């Protein structure tokens, strides 16, 4: 996991409460290109089980929260 992967996850978790949040909103918050996130960052995070795509946007999984030593509120 590189710095962009970590920033993506922390953005979704910390700025958007774990999601769902749209990719364009994430890109703007990260000051990055939507296409870069969709083509480079997101596929890795989805494959690792850290992010799920939904119709409403991207959602951080419980695994993503655990990776940072956090507890996902809806899993309490």
What role is predicted for each listed range?
Residues 2-13:
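Hydrophobic residues on short alpha-helical segments
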Residues 12-76:
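Terminal-proximal interaction/regulatory segments of ATP-powered molecular machines
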